Amino acid sequence: MEMVKDVCQDILKSVGQVHVLVNNAGLALGLTAYQDYEEWDLLTMLDTNVKGLMMVTRQILPSMVAANEGHIINMGSTAGIYAYAGAAVYSATKAAVKTFSDGLRIDTIATDIKVTTIQPGIVETDFSQVRFHGDKDKAAKVYQGLEALQAQDIAEAVLYVTKQPRRVQISDMTIMANQQATGFTIHREE
């Protein structure tokens, strides 16, 4: 985590004030019952999805507090709301993102810092290819038979929450594909 600290400090030195922090790094590894998870996969998800997000925030937040302004946007997932089979660890990490964001909002309530959690559903990116350790065929099946969200949809959501007036704080935004009812309740065309 020392590298995270160094990178964040370099950013603060080069740009001065960070007005918007988007904690977007996240991954899932595997889709298996908890007892069958590879330890490395489990620890990598915790390190990336929870510890990495917290450490970046820890480095950037003090400058926001000093300036009494900023917006922290943390990428959660519908998996953090609706756990599904084979994703106990991933779901837990994304639930942690939501709970951390809520706590951070409470800790900064006396400031003009906003904290938003965006919780996307199924988005067609390289996420599934990473989850299945590079297996492109397995990853492609995740998106078959439905019109998944696209990265641009999530980028537009980020822009939307940042463009609100000072008096408006969007605490949570959940975005799902039209054929998605919960994290893994998805209608697929045959």
Feature roles, as predicted:
Residues 57, 93:
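Active-site helix of classical SDR
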Residues 77:
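Residue(s) in the substrate-gating loop at a strand-loop-helix junction
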Residues 82, 103-113:
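Active-site-adjacent segment of SDR/Rossmann-fold oxidoreductases
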Residues 32-34, 38-43:
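Substrate-binding pocket helix/loop in short-chain dehydrogenase/reductase
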Residues 117-121, 137-184:
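C-terminal helical subdomain
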Residues 1-6, 39:
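The beta1-alpha1 cofactor-binding region of Rossmann-like NAD(H)/NADP(H)-dependent oxidoreductases
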Residues 35, 84-88:
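Active-site loop immediately N-terminal to the catalytic Tyr-X3-Lys motif
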